[in-house]
């Protein structure tokens, strides 16, 4: 569960909030904030969890261009909140990923494990496709690729910037962030954004 406290200090509000994931289902938490000054902040970057090509397609369709993000704020390390971070890095995200130190440490383990599981699942799926399509049509590709691999995880982990609980810090001139212990899991935080427009 994402716990967010948003404080907006402004007379007229034109900031945009898009609820991209975890709206009609439990997994895939992603919430995009665009401030009046044009900063784009992604709150969590969760993976849809399930089996089959429908889940794969949902994870590949992010609902935003990763190259346009300024930063990611991560509430905790559960994969339905953090699992697509290496994928957005693979797709061009280059900003900072803000979280608590424990969340970063857990993400290092959990995202590595997720990459390994994807590689195993894809290997098995591709073998199944080979058996089902022994006489493939020329020029058609039936194989699938994992969303990301260990190299993508390593690149993503270099973007993590950590702050301890109850320490208020500045994301941008007009945006402050404080992590407060949520009690949800080790390192899990209520993310309090103060946006001065």
Enumerate the predicted regions with their spans.
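Hydrophobic transmembrane signal anchors and adjacent membrane-proximal interface regions, especially
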Residues: 4-7, 144, 169
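Pre-active-site segment of Zn-dependent metallo-hydrolases
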Residues: 23-28, 35-95, 99-158
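Short acidic-hydrophobic, aromatic-tinged amphipathic segments that line or gate anion-handling sites
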Residues: 158-165
